[in-house]
């Protein structure tokens, strides 16, 4: 699982005037991530499934920042409903965002779930794959025209070391047979990395970078999905490997903001350092196959980019 070696990331420059989207940020590592963007002047879109919980989180963020930082120096928190397990909700979110936001400078695809039993999304996909990967795939592609128009911009996909144990079950993608919580989770996190590499390749030279990362092990609400025995084992192991929340969000902030990554795209990071991927995550064939399959699953039709212009990429509902 790796050591808890990283130090909290120090943001060196303010981001006044920049718009940042963070998915799943009413809890877990998403919340302090949103807080840091807000603290240094960002216009932060809190994209959350539960609006009431997001409002409570936003109030807590504002109070926390006010305690240690002049409030007039902070940015703005904007709450928008986004349920990544529903394609309709994603479309509604994007429509709303396109009406209210002129630019998207940073997209942090952070939201994630685990489920001890097999469940499905509103559209019939296995819940973990549908939320952690496919929902973010659909969201990112629908937002691409606005992101490209805002270049330079960054897309940050939160993955996990669990990808090393994952594989794409091409003939059983929704795990209707032999479902397992970690099988589903590791598949979704591998998919995040394959998507990152394929999208980075397609956006090469267009001013938008795409990177993935492992934040490390931390005490987040995702552990609520663990069963009793696993939770007990986790209780023993946790102190040995768990990162503090400031440590856990370090690599997210690094990938989103650090100037040293201005030209880096398609890579995987942990503890603020580029890491070599396992061989099965480097398969260009699998990345392309997953891309094409994902387009079909969410009902999108892609047209080629022309002359490296943002308006040359058209993605429309089929």
Residue positions per predicted region:
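Juxtamembrane interface at the ends
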Residues: 231-235
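Universal eukaryotic N-terminal targeting presequences
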Residues: 1-2, 317
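A broadly tuned preference for mixed-charge, low-complexity surface segments
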Residues: 99-100, 161, 262-272, 304-318
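Residues within alpha-helical segments
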Residues: 35, 55-58, 197, 249, ...
């Amino acid at each position: 699982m790796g050591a808890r070696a990283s130090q909290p990331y120090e943001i060196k420059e303010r981001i006044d005037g920049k718009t940042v989207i963070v998915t799943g940020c009413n809890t877990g590592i998403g919340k302090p991530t949103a807080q840091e963007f807000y603290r240094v002047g960002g216009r932060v879109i809190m994209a959350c499934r539960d609006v009431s919980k997001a409002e409570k989180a936003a109030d807590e963020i504002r109070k926390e920042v006010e305690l240690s930082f002049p409030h007039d120096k902070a940015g703005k928190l904007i709450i928008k409903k986004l349920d990544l397990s529903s394609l309709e909700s994603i479309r509604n979110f994007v429509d709303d965002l396109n009406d209210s936001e002129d630019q998207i400078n940073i997209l942090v695809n952070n939201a994630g779930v685990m489920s001890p039993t097999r469940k499905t999304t509103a559209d019939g996909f296995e819940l973990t794959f549908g939320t952690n990967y496919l929902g973010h795939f659909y969201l990112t592609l629908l937002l691409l025209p606005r992101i490209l128009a805002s270049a330079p911009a960054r897309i940050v996909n939160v993955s996990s070391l669990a990808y090393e144990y994952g594989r794409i079950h091409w003939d059983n993608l929704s795990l209707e047979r032999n479902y397992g919580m970690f099988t589903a989770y590791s598949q979704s996190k591998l998919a995040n990395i394959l998507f990152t590499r394929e999208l980075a390749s397609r956006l090469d030279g267009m001013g938008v970078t795409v990177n993935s990362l492992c934040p490390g092990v931390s005490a987040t609400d995702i552990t609520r999905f663990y069963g009793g025995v696993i939770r007990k084992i986790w209780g023993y192991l946790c102190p040995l490997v768990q990162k503090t929340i400031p440590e856990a969000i370090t690599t997210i902030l690094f990938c989103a903001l650090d100037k040293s990554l201005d030209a880096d795209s398609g890579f995987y990071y942990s503890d603020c350092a580029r890491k070599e991927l396992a061989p099965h995550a480097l398969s260009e064939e699998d990345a392309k196959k997953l891309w094409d399959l994902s387009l079909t699953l969410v009902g999108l039709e892609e047209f080629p980019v022309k002359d490296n212009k943002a308006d040359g990429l058209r993605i429309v509902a089929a």
